[in-house]
Amino acid sequence: MPKGLLGKKVGMTQIFTDTGLAVPVTVIEAGPCIVVQKKTPEKDGYSAIQLGFGAKKERSFNKPMLGHFLAARVRPLRYLREVRVENPETYQVGQEIKADIFAPGEKVDVVGTTKGRGFAGGIKRHGFHRGPMAHGSKYHRRPGSLGAKGPARVFKGRRLPGHLGMERVTVQNLEVVKVDADRNLLAVKGAVPGPKGGLVLIKQAAKARG
């Protein structure tokens, strides 16, 4: 059954296997999440549950959002995200979901927002080559030609300098190495997008392999 959990990236470390191999892992504070709403095919056209995560002061919410939490009889939560499930009937509004829904060895997809890098040039943003660095060169790190003379315009999608980062990125098929159910911590093999403290969504792998 598809499952998911909201969490917060804690940072990276390494875990040693029984054979002494160092495995790089990202530690995620996964949950506890609360089911705030259920979506059913009869009413909404698809099956999903809405999860809430993180504390936030009540005065920071507007009245529509407070009413949404009041209808579910749950405390106000900082983040709300939907997770597709096959049988929303198996969940109850107000139910708490913890990190123990995942087990070591399981494959997961992790969705996060990459670090914002601000305005970046073509070399950093797209991996362009530099121009000649010789004394007579007229350009060194500039983007170069924008296209042919004939169309007399720049085509859509042309790779140019601009804002880098702050994009939603999904990393697929990360292995769950360790689960600490008491502290709601997950250790997944490899890197996860985003800064420390960034919000991540951990889902059952859509294309799990091996």
Swiss-Prot record:
| Organism phylogeny | Bacteria, Bacillati, Bacillota, Clostridia, Eubacteriales
Keyword flag Ribosomal protein:
yes
Q: Which region ranges are annotated with the description Disordered?
A: 121-150
Assembly, per entry: Part of the 50S ribosomal subunit. Forms a cluster with proteins L14 and L19.
Which Gene3D superfamilies does its entry note? 3.30.160.810, Translation factors
Hey, which family's this protein in?
Answer: Belongs to the universal ribosomal protein uL3 family.
Query: By its UniProt entry, which HAMAP family does this protein fall under?
Result: Ribosomal_uL3_B (MF_01325_B)
Under Gene Ontology molecular function, one entry of this record is: structural constituent of ribosome
Which branch of life, at top level? Bacteria
Q: What is this protein called?
A: Large ribosomal subunit protein uL3
- What keywords sit in the KW lines? Ribonucleoprotein, Ribosomal protein, RNA-binding, rRNA-binding
What are the GO cellular component annotations?
cytosolic large ribosomal subunit
Q: Which GO terms describe its biological process?
A: translation
Function statement: One of the primary rRNA binding proteins, it binds directly near the 3'-end of the 23S rRNA, where it nucleates assembly of the 50S subunit.
